[in-house]
Amino acid sequence: MMKTLLLFVGLLLTWESGQVLGDQTVSDNELQEMSNQGSKYVNKEIQNAVNGVKQIKTLIEKTNEERKTLLSNLEEAKKKKEDALNETRESETKLKELPGVCNETMMALWEECKPCLKQTCMKFYARVCRSGSGLVGRQLEEFLNQSSPFYFWMNGDRIDSLLENDRQQTHMLDVMQDHFSRASSIIDELFQDRFFTREPQDTYHYLPFSLPHRRPHFFFPKSRIVRSLMPFSPYEPLNFHAMFQPFLEMIHEAQQAMDIHFHSPAFQHPPTEFIREGDDDRTVCREIRHNSTGCLRMKDQCDKCREILSVDCSTNNPSQAKLRRELDESLQVAERLTRKYNELLKSYQWKMLNTSSLLEQLNEQFNWVSRLANLTQGEDQYYLRVTTVASHTSDSDVPSGVTEVVVKLFDSDPITVTVPVEVSRKNPKFMETVAEKALQEYRKKHREE
């Protein structure tokens, strides 16, 4: 009985020092060397993460340059579009100031046009738009009774659509510019740090075990953020998390600034294009619900409505016919330029979305390192410390020859990884395999939280 008890105590003691059944003792020196090698691998992965951040920084800067070029094109297109709109409004004003001609002819046609237009529009709405037909019908009746054939004759609906489109486009660009400028100032501050402009020093410095435990600065020692956050001596224990946290906070702030505008009402209903028969029904439905002007798009389906558009008043007033031609020409130019502007605006929005996506990647690259660094509260010199190595025999529950290694990443909870039989403890890749699996396990756990 006494022999059995002594044997059990001996096994416990050897377990504490790293020895396991079926294998020779793993000495403290071996555990330290394993920790040393594993820490080198973790250090390399941190360096890779930082290099990845720098690559994303380059992409963000490239995207921003493309955005600036696109914005310049937008401003040029906006000026041309507004000039065309001004010409259209001037032609419309001149046409309205002329004494009415052909009024009797147009009024007679208008009275026959209205019932057909209403019936055609309500059939379309009931079939395609479906919701709220009763309210839309009453709204349309009022709209048609208040409209004049002259408004119809000079394409007033197209002019109104242009002006509404211009208002929405201006608002959308203002919203994007406002939020991007906020994000941009944060990004600029982030990237001005010397960490992004110089190669960082090696993050891991191997010290004799007799010296005080410490870690060197991860970022360049004279970095603005390191300098402001860590005014203490470089020989004091390093607050690793404090170096990453400002970056994460700034990235999150930039993301919030970029995300706001994509959820604003302006982006839920972007400016409409000039839709002809057979085009986007959803936009027509929205216009009908908004102010009934969408129904005027269906004028080509009613004979009497088409006749109004073809009324020729040049015999009675040649100047009116001339002004109408000028109005039609300026209207076509304004519509074409507005379509072009809308395409540029969409491209600009895609650039904004791309920047937002790159910020998400930037956050992902920094986040796992920061979360890992957040665990670093002690003065242990190792990024990865090996606490137990167990090589299993055929008597254990684990397959024979497999090695179980328990490690800690900084001050994390212990992580157990298994190393296959073909990678023995003497294999140079042994600790690289252990560290790689430990980081994978850590990242997996982090994603699941």
From Swiss-Prot:
Changing residue 226 to T: Does not affect proteolytic cleavage. It comes from the Eukaryota. Changing residue 291 to Q: Decreases molecular mass of alpha chain. Decreases secretion. Disulfide bonds join 102-313, 113-305, 116-302, 121-295, 129-285. A motif (Nuclear localization signal) lies at residues 78-81, 443-447. Induction: Up-regulated in response to enterovirus 71 (EV71) infection (at protein level). Up-regulated by agents that induce apoptosis, both at mRNA and protein level. Isoform 1 is up-regulated by androgen. Isoform 2 is down-regulated by androgen. One of its GO terms (cellular component) is synapse. GO terms for biological process: amyloid-beta clearance; cell morphogenesis; central nervous system myelin maintenance; chaperone-mediated protein complex assembly; chaperone-mediated protein folding; complement activation; complement activation, classical pathway; immune complex clearance. Proteolytically cleaved on its way through the secretory system, probably within the Golgi lumen. Proteolytic cleavage is not necessary for its chaperone activity. All non-secreted forms are not proteolytically cleaved. Chaperone activity of uncleaved forms is dependent on a non-reducing environment. Changing residue 103 to Q: Decreases molecular mass of beta chain. Keywords: Apoptosis, Chaperone, Complement pathway, Cytoplasm, Cytoplasmic vesicle, Disulfide bond, Endoplasmic reticulum, Glycoprotein, Immunity, Innate immunity, Membrane, Microsome, Mitochondrion, Nucleus, Phosphoprotein, Secreted, Signal, Ubl conjugation. The modification Phosphoserine is found at residues 133, 396. Transmembrane segments: none annotated. Detected in blood plasma, cerebrospinal fluid, milk, seminal plasma and colon mucosa. Detected in the germinal center of colon lymphoid nodules and in colon parasympathetic ganglia of the Auerbach plexus (at protein level). Ubiquitous. Detected in brain, testis, ovary, liver and pancreas, and at lower levels in kidney, heart, spleen and lung. Glycans are attached at residues 86, 103, 145, 291, 354, 374. GO terms for molecular function: amyloid-beta binding; low-density lipoprotein particle receptor binding; misfolded protein binding; protein carrier chaperone; protein-containing complex binding; protein-folding chaperone binding; receptor ligand activity; signaling receptor binding. Belongs to the clusterin family. This is Clusterin. It comes from Homo sapiens (Human).
